[in-house]
Amino acid sequence: MVVGAAKVIAAGGVDAMSLRELAIQAGVPLGSTYHHFPDGKAQLVDEAVRLVGAQVTQLIEEARTQGTDTVLQVFADRWRRVLEVSEYAAGCPVAAAAVATDPRHHDVAREVFADWHAALTKALRDSGVPPKRAGRLARTVVAATEGAVSLARASRSSAPLDEVVDELATLVDSARTR
């Protein structure tokens, strides 16, 4: 159900997610959803956002040993797959939680973005970017990629992701101490 919730949130936002619909899709009684998620929809949304966050953090950490170009590409490719598989109907559920009507989800989105920031900062520092600059660049990577996901959805094209990755790679390369 958590994976299903993440998909619904990515496509329609937090408000589109319904426990009843997810229970029907999963083929489980509605009561069992409240057994597993006693805090209801809010808990399921937060767990879905944390799951996606952890998956992306793991991708960044695994790619770190292959260099920042690979890290940037892996980060963008994660969202490219989501966009293309959904025919550009879905984006990032973390971003959806960040702008949700219910402010309870903002804290979880902030935690996930902080995890991505930390993983990207480490990858950038490992590649020779000075520590202070690495933190700022990591935030730029997250912001630019999230923006590119929105642009890609609107244009129904992955071109914004490609352009952002190319520009970020140039920016990172120029930030390395030589």
Give a label for each model feature.
Residues 4-47:
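Helix-turn-helix
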Residues 57, 61, 77, 103-128, ...:
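Amphipathic alpha-helical packing segments from all-alpha helical-bundle domains
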Residues 59-90, 138-141:
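Hydrophobic alpha-helical connector segments
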Residues 67, 104, 155-156:
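Short helix-adjacent coil turns
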Residues 142-159, 173-178:
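Amphipathic C-terminal alpha-helical segment
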Residues 85-107:
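Amphipathic alpha-helical segments used for helix-helix packing
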Residues 49-55:
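Short, basic, alpha-helical segments at the C-terminal edge of helix-turn-helix-like DNA-binding modules
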Residues 15-16, 128-133:
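Short, charged helix-capping/linker segments at alpha-helix termini
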